[in-house]
């Protein structure tokens, strides 16, 4: 790897996951479209996707799709159901079901230099577990170092700030 040594000081490297280390946008859009139709009878628009879905915790997205009418129990149900559909779509998409080129080599480099790194993602825990198992991410990052949507974060920015 041709990585130039640097004198930049930092505490940790934080990676986003979906759409950065793993190109899965089409699977998310397909799953959210399916649930938008189920919840409100219509699919999602590109504007809704950009403003209310991408990078937003599931609870907020489902609250948006339901017009704020769902109970916490309904929100949790649809969140789990949507993500199960998403995981199925990922496994069916065998051509794209892998980390981006160079990710594993870069993780190896960071680990060899003892540079701490982690992943912060708006994904829920079952998806994080799915990614860890599917891509063997625990070769580089301990399971308890992943930051994910556990219902306590307002947005992805808060997750990134908490990551290191």
Locations of regions flagged by a protein language model:
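Conserved Lys-Pro-Asp/Glu-containing loop-to-beta segment of HAD-superfamily phosphomonoesterases
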Residues: 12, 154-164
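Generic recognition of short, well-ordered alpha-helical segments
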Residues: 26-30, 130, 158
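N-terminal helical cap/lid subdomain that shapes the substrate entry/recognition surface
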Residues: 6-101, 109, 113
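Short alpha-helical
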Residues: 27, 57, 105, 126-127, ...
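Well-ordered alpha-helical segments embedded in enzymatic catalytic cores
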Residues: 102-106, 159-162
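Substrate-recognition/cap helix-loop segment adjacent to the acidic, metal-dependent catalytic center
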Residues: 39, 64-68, 104, 108-118, ...
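A short, compositionally biased domain-edge/stem linker segment
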Residues: 1-4
